Amino acid sequence: MSSRLHSCIVNALTFSRVPLIFAFLVCAVLAQCRACVGLAVAAGVLMFCAAISDLYDGRLARKWKVVSTFGKLADPLMDKVFFIVSFPTLLWVIGAQGESPTHALVMLVFTVLYILRDQWVTFLRSVAAAYRADVGAMWLGKVRTALSFPAAAYIYAYLALHHLLPPACQGPLMASVYAVEGVLIALNVYSCAVYTRVYWPYLVRAIGAK
């Protein structure tokens, strides 16, 4: 295959996250409203496919040597679309189930922190870019993104299927979901602090500029 075709395949894989994650939203809402396990499974499969596309688009781009500036910009944008859709959907499902106000609160804090962190880091990078700083993704940001995909899938799997499990299993699984959310909340706060520290000199320069 030509490099042009390779590039088209990689870009299609990257952008496939948008229809997949919106299809997840629809299936997850319908599954909750209709109490349909089949729709819940379909929603889980759609989320998994959207998440796995993030793993393979970059891998194929490097394998086929079609890494591009467009791809480097599109990939994090598609990641943001995934999280902006998936986490509020999870929050809605928790609220619709009405079983745990505490879990809803934890998920609300997590979702708000996640979105605010992304906006803050984007702002810091924009300021630093004006001074020609290196604004590439840090390893911490990559780890956060890599962990967030399976975390979202795990949380949804619990929400969709926990009522089918024996009561003795539900407590430990709920604790594991809280643990996952707690780790990601801490990682978001830490990531925000690290990016702020790195780009702080450029922010100070921008504030003092006339």
How would you name each of these model-derived features?
Residues 1-11, 15-21, 38-51, 128, ...:
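C-terminal membrane-associated helical module and adjoining short loops/tails
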Residues 12, 19-73, 85-93, 100-114, ...:
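Membrane-embedded alpha-helical segments that form the functional core of polytopic membrane enzymes
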Residues 16-24, 76-90, 117-122, 144-156:
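Core segments of transmembrane alpha-helices
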Residues 28-32, 93-96, 129, 158-162:
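Short helix-capping/hinge motifs at transmembrane helix termini and TM-loop junctions
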Residues 54-57, 75, 79, 118, ...:
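Acidic side chains
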Residues 115-134:
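Membrane-proximal helix-loop-helix units in multi-pass membrane proteins
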